[in-house]
Each structure stands twice: as C-alpha cells, then as structure tokens.
Design a protein with these regions (language model features):
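Active-site neighborhoods and metal-handling regions in enzymes and metal-associated proteins
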Residues: 1-266
Length: 266
C-alpha cells in the first residue's frame, strides 16, 4: 500500500477541483425535477465542468471488466446504490431520489463528491434515510484526524446508521484521492476503533457512506456498472473529499451551494 501525503500546494489544487465539483452538483440541482432525463443531467454536467477548464474524471474510467464508463457523472436512482449510467430512458419522477456522483480533474488533481437529491416530494421515511446518511458522513469526518485510524471512520458511520435500522454496504468503500481518482487507503463504512491504517496529516481521502433502507445486500446490474439493492429498497449516498489534519479534518468539497438551493425550494 502506497499512501501519498499531500503538500499544502497540492491541497490547494485539490481544493479547487473539489470546489468545482460542489458547483457542478449545485448546477445539476437546478435541473432536478420530474420529466428530466439523466442523460440531460449528464450533458449539463459535462458542459459545466469543461467550461470551467476541467475534465470529467469518470468518463472512460474502467470497471473491473476493463470496460470504460460511458458518461460524465453517475446517476443512481432509488434502489441503485452507485454507478448508474445516465440514459435518455431514465426519466425522473415525483418521489424519486437520485444520487449524483461527480468527479473533476483540474490542474492535475481530482475532486470527488456525491449528493442524493429528492425529486419533488419524497416519502418521509426516505427523507429520513437521506438525513441519517448525510449525518453519518459528518460523523465519519469528525473521526478523520491525525492519529486516528481508518477503522474509527468506519465505526462511527456503521454504528450510527445501524442504530437507525439501516443497512451499511460492505462491498463499496471510500478511498484515497489525489493525482489519481482512487488511491490508497481504502476507507470502508464499517470497522472497529483503532483498526486499520493510521491517519496522518496531509492524507486526502474520500469518505462516502452508502446506506440502504432495507437489506444491505447488493447486486451488479446487467450493464456491469450499476449496483443496486437486491430487495429494491432505496439507498442513499453522500460523499466528501477531505484532508486529514491534526485536531480537525478539513472538508475540501462542498454541499453549501446545493443546500442553499434546496433551502430556496422549501
């Protein structure tokens, strides 16, 4: 395992890439409504990212079968946990939730973040799933400080979500990030305190709880990309890229613009 600690100059570049991801998610949030297709969202994202001098990282990213991802963002609706492929056939409907995972490459460094949006009015139980998942992300971030371990992050996420009766996906994890989208160490959403890689100042990692309303079991869709819950219950996914610091982690990505937009729509 090779972990790259980032310099302050490198962290500044990563901050810019991640801020662009936040702006892209907010731009997409303006268009999330019934009748919109996920392919439309993908085109909006690509244009926005490229207009800001960056490249969509996910385009042509290979899966374990060596097949390139055919789109610019991942659009995962309802029971699809991750890696949903945008399509003109996927039309958003009132009451859906959609997780949009977005990555950018800017000045040689990557940004990565995900947000689960509501499409119109969503059932209160589903809203609760989103709320708990987002809160678990911040609990994980609170534990991402120098001297702690990767297991401290996973433990805080797992214990909080399972206390609410939700399933924590085991097979999908967070990751280190920098010049490459996926670097060491893996960052699972479960674990035991004091276990795993020790966190050091300057480590940049993406923390991303993927939480299910029902059974935690998942399966690969026929397109070899999308991964969905086997019981077809909804799943939520929130992700921030952070840098490990002494005392308190620094969040490099941002939900501020998205949440401001959501506040205007209440």
């Amino acid at each position: 395992m090779q972990i790259f600690l980032k310099t302050e100059d490198e962290i500044n570049l990563m901050r810019k890439a991640n801020q662009l991801v936040g702006l892209t998610l907010a731009e997409l949030g303006k268009h999330i409504k019934p009748g919109v297709t996920t392919l439309q969202l993908d085109r909006i994202a690509e244009e926005f990212i490229r207009d800001h001098g960056a490249v969509p990282t996910f385009k042509n990213f290979p899966n374990p079968f060596g097949e390139p991802f055919p789109a610019n963002i991942c659009t995962s609706i309802n029971d699809v946990v991750v890696h949903g492929i945008p399509s003109e056939d996927d039309v958003l409907r009132e009451g859906d939730i959609i997780s949009i995972d977005c990555g950018t490459l800017l000045d040689g460094f990557n940004g990565d973040s995900c947000y689960t949006f509501c499409v119109g009015e969503v059932h209160p139980e589903v809203k609760q799933l989103l709320s708990v998942t987002k809160q678990s992300l911040y609990l994980g971030i609170e534990n991402a400080v120098a001297g702690n371990h990767v297991g401290d992050i996973g433990f805080s996420i797992q214990s909080y979500c399972e206390s609410h009766g939700y399933g924590v996906v085991r097979e999908l994890v967070g990751h280190g990030i920098g010049k490459a989208m996926h670097e060491d160490p893996p960052v699972p959403n479960l674990g035991r305190r004091g276990n795993g890689v020790m966190l050091k100042d300057g480590m940049c990692i993406a923390i991303e709880p993927m939480i299910t309303m029902g059974n935690r079991k998942i399966g690969l869709l026929p397109d070899k990309w999308g991964i969905a819950t086997v019981d077809h219950q909804p799943a939520a996914h929130f992700e921030h890229t952070i840098v490990v610091r002494k005392g308190k982690a620094e969040i490099l990505s941002s939900f501020q613009e998205v949440e401001h937009l959501e506040g205007q729509n209440i």
